[in-house]
Each structure stands twice: as structure tokens, then as C-alpha cells.
Amino acid sequence: MVDILGERHLVTCKGATVEAEAALQNKVVALYFAAARCAPSRDFTPLLCDFYTALVAEARRPAPFEVVFVSADGSSQEMLDFMRELHGAWLALPFHDPYRHELRKRYNVTAIPKLVIVKQNGEVITNKGRKQIRERGLACFQDWVEAADIFQNFSV
């Protein structure tokens, strides 16, 4: 993810800071554009949380997958509350990082929630991640891994 997040830092729902490059290396990355005040975001986030948990947190062998939340919330407190209430143990771009706006433009985010699945170089695998998870569940992940050119023996 050097190409799109570079030397940036990401945060956890507990407030810890991690280096984006180390946290996202050799993983399929889902950029999750959402906000607490958005009813469709509040509806989809628990489903994404279950998807993430099944692939990463509770898996015998964690999948090469990470979600990066790109908040459209009105304040850092609103973002943090949303993360603590409904999110999985995934990462987020800090609220005060202006790069949030650049990512929205780069990935043509005109409505939320939107889940954009990207390769390590930032190239889009699909901008319909939300729809694919709703329709296909865990089965869509294998397609993402193959498209991401991550050579790892993984099966759902």
C-alpha cells in the first residue's frame, strides 16, 4: 500500500497508532468510506465486521485482508464512537488527516457507504465490495485475493 498510504499512520479503535506500510503489506485492502450518521453505513458496518471477523480475527489462519476506515463523520469524536460501537478490529485513517478527502476523490466516492477493494499499488479490484459481500459473503474474498496478485495459499 505504499502507493496510496505511503508513510502515513493509521489508528485502531483503541487509539493506538500503526504504520500503514507495515500493517497493510501483502494484504488485500478494503477502503471503507462511511459515517456514523448515515443509516446505510450503520446497517452495513455490522455485516462488514462479521466478514472481517470470520476472515481474520476468528480464522485458524488469518486471511491476508485489512479494512481501512475512511471517515465521513462530522468530528473525530463521532468517528471514534462509531468505530468503538460497530467496527471490527480494523484500522482507520486519522480524522484530521486531510488525505481522507484525496482518497474520496481518487476512488470517486460520491455516496456512502462504499467499500473499495484495492491492490497493494492502489489499483481498484472492485468498487462494489459492499454489494459483493451482501450477495456472496465470504466467497468473494477468494476472487479478491486472486485479483490482488497475492501469492498465498488461502481458501475460504
From Swiss-Prot:
CDD domains: TryX_like_family
Domain Thioredoxin: 9-147
Transmembrane segments: none
Coiled-coil portions: none
Family note: Belongs to the nucleoredoxin family.
Protein's job: May be involved in the maintenance of both the function and the viability of sensory neurons, including photoreceptors and olfactory neurons.
Protein name, entry field: Nucleoredoxin-like protein 2
Species whose genome carries this gene: Homo sapiens
